[in-house]
Amino acid sequence: MELPRFATFLKDVIKEAGQVSLHLFKIMIPILIGVKILQQAGLIAYLAMPLDPVMRIMGLPGETGLVWATAMVNNLYSAIIVFLSLSESMQLSVAQVTVLSTVMLVAHGLPIEVKIAQSAGTRFLFQALTRIGGGFVLGWILHLTYSLTGTLQQANTIFWQGDVPAQPPPLPMWAAEQIKNLALIFCIILVLVVLMRIMHKLRIVDGLTWLLRPVLRFLGIGREAATLTIIGMVMGLTYGGGLIIQESRSGTVEARDVFASLTLMGLTHSLIEDTLLLTMIGAHLSGILWARLLFSLLVVAGLVRLLPLLPGGFVHHTLFAKEGEPSADRGA
């Protein structure tokens, strides 16, 4: 590649990565601050109280509601810290840890991740309820399956070797950590933008779409959203969702595909990192990977087939914005 062309290419990808990152940061920074305030004020514990009976239906001690509430409001790492602090007093089985880990994987980081999905054109309330409700239904199914078959009933073993902090880090340290995380997000998005351009140039995207055609047809996801969906499922909703925001604003991806893609990404994403993370506290792959993946595919396939049967007004009011209609925070 000639030097002037390379300079133009570099300028373009940095600009695109900057635009994607800026959209994400506008969403993430206020929510990060809000969640930190909730954490500092000790309010997350109150959010966990209504979850006590819900956790018991899934065969879990009521105390695990605090773990799931922490995951939903904050992130998996914070939830794991809470889990480790409670684990000695709870004496859970592998099946119970797998159920808890699976519901955490389906519904975590909701303020940021659902807001990202909304920014791309889906409806906030539906996405949030789908993930919370989906986590509960899947957790209940796993609980029944493990209980009726007598599977994974042995005492759980925790492999996590990290230290459990006695208290949250001071605010300056927390702020520095968030800035580092945001910088890392920009770097990863920059790499993804470069990879996407290379894959389009080499027609790798066309090859992937052809290979995944049966699955995409089953899910009702168009080829334009295929690669972005894969990125989100493998790497995380922040990255896949961030790229879809850019594509949806340019009109490249249809609203129906955005809805199907982001719903699938919401239910199952970060298939490698998050799955490995939860195995460190003893969760079994049968729940946190295979059941989660199968459940997510079936839910999205069912929703896509249900869409044509629903009134258009209900769909656009409840599920996703009309084609060309700005979402709640577009243009911000």
Where are these regions (language model features)?
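Transmembrane helix-loop-helix hairpins in multi-pass inner-membrane proteins
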Residues: A107-P165, E273, L278-L310, T318
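Alpha-helical transmembrane segments of polytopic integral membrane proteins
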Residues: I27, I31-G34, Q40, I44, ...
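Membrane-water interface at transmembrane helix exits
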Residues: I31, V35-Q39, F83-S87, A117, ...
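Alpha-helical membrane segments and immediately flanking helix-loop junctions
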Residues: P61-A120, F218-L278
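Selected transmembrane alpha-helices and immediately adjacent juxtamembrane segments
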Residues: M1-V54, I132-W140, L144-L216, L294, ...
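Small-residue-enriched transmembrane helix starts and helix-helix packing motifs
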Residues: V13, P50-A69, W174, A225
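Hydrophobic alpha-helical transmembrane segments
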Residues: F25, Q39-L51, W68-F83, T98-V99, F124-G134, M173-A176, ...
